[in-house]
């Protein structure tokens, strides 16, 4: 079990946290970006359990290359939970930026144009958060946070992060426990930033392996100790350690000179 606790205890801790943060902010509730993936689905389920369906707004923000199945799954989550949801297509915004793949003169750039999508979605989330006095509930998990798998000032930006202390493999267990639809749990995780993209292909590592390394990293183990304990190739372990170090800037505020 997670941290040696039962699933019920984990759910109770997270839902208590959500309620407390909403009350502290004197907010009317939360807004969640629904991608149709497991992380946003679990976040939405937990927010509804914490606050009730009337205090949770879902935002579905597809563009022309979004997998229709993902939109279908996002709507399924919103409708299963009975929450209000808004579909805001971002294709025209991408065209206005002259993003690659959306105007004839530019080819798609995975980094620049992929990150642009995440930042546009962040702006829309905060627009509705401001409009209705809501907190933005982020959907990043602990695995993503450690290795920097997210867009700075994009999907990383949020007011609260309900599943931010759960590794990806733990999110999957929790999803089964709280009743997230099976088809969402079992499909390959994807940030949905370009057609056919999957997390594990982009990260070049399976989440099971990644989480095994990260849990031992948290305990202060060296790459050599992790290799000896798990038999995971040292090259893979060093790769994960490098990702953690390289992406530290995504976990901290911008550096400021001392004066």
From Swiss-Prot:
Keyword field contains Magnesium: yes
Gene3D superfamilies named among the record's database cross-references: HUPs
Signal sequence coordinates: none
Residues the entry annotates as binding ATP: 33-40, 139, 168, 190
Any GO BP: NAD biosynthetic process
Catalytic function, reaction form: deamido-NAD(+) + NH4(+) + ATP = AMP + diphosphate + NAD(+) + H(+)
Pfam families in alphabetical order: NAD_synthase (PF02540)
Enzyme class per UniProt: ligase
Protein keywords: ATP-binding, Ligase, Magnesium, Metal-binding, NAD, Nucleotide-binding
Record-listed deamido-NAD(+) binding positions: 119, 152, 159, 249-250
Binding site for Mg(2+): 39, 144
A GO term from the CC aspect: cytoplasm
One term of GO molecular function: metal ion binding
E.C. number: 6.3.1.5
Annotated pathway: Cofactor biosynthesis; NAD(+) biosynthesis; NAD(+) from deamido-NAD(+) (ammonia route): step 1/1
Family under the similarity heading: Belongs to the NAD synthetase family.
Xref: NCBIfam families: nadE, PRK13980.1
Quaternary context: Homodimer.
Protein name: NH(3)-dependent NAD(+) synthetase
Organism: Methanocaldococcus jannaschii (strain ATCC 43067 / DSM 2661 / JAL-1 / JCM 10045 / NBRC 100440) (Methanococcus jannaschii)
């Amino acid at each position: 079990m997670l941290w040696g606790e039962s699933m019920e205890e984990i759910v109770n801790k997270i839902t208590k946290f959500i309620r407390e943060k909403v009350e502290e902010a004197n907010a009317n509730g939360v807004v969640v970006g629904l991608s149709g993936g497991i992380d946003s689905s679990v976040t939405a389920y937990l927010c509804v359990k914490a606050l009730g369906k009337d205090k949770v707004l879902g935002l579905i923000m597809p563009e022309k290359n979004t997998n229709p199945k993902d939109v279908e799954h996002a709507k399924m989550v919103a409708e299963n939970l009975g929450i209000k949801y808004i579909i805001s297509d971002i294709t025209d915004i991408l065209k206005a930026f002259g993003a690659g793949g959306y105007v004839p003169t530019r080819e798609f750039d995975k980094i620049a144009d992929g990150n642009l999508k995440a930042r546009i979605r962040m702006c829309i989330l905060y627009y509705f958060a401001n409009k209705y006095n809501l907190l933005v509930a982020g959907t990043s998990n602990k695995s993503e946070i450690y290795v920097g798998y997210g867009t700075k000032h994009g999907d990383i930006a949020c007011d609260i992060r309900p599943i931010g202390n759960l590794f990806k493999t733990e999110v999957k267990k929790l999803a089964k426990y709280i009743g997230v639809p099976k088809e969402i749990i079992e499909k390959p995780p994807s940030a949905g930033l370009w057609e056919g993209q999957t997390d594990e292909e982009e990260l070049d590592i399976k989440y099971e392996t990644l989480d095994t390394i990260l849990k031992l990293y948290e305990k202060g183990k060296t790459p050599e100790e992790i290799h000896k304990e798990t038999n995971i190739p040292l090259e893979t372990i060093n790769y994960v350690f490098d990702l953690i170090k390289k992406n530290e800037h995504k976990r901290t505020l911008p550096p400021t000179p001392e004066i």
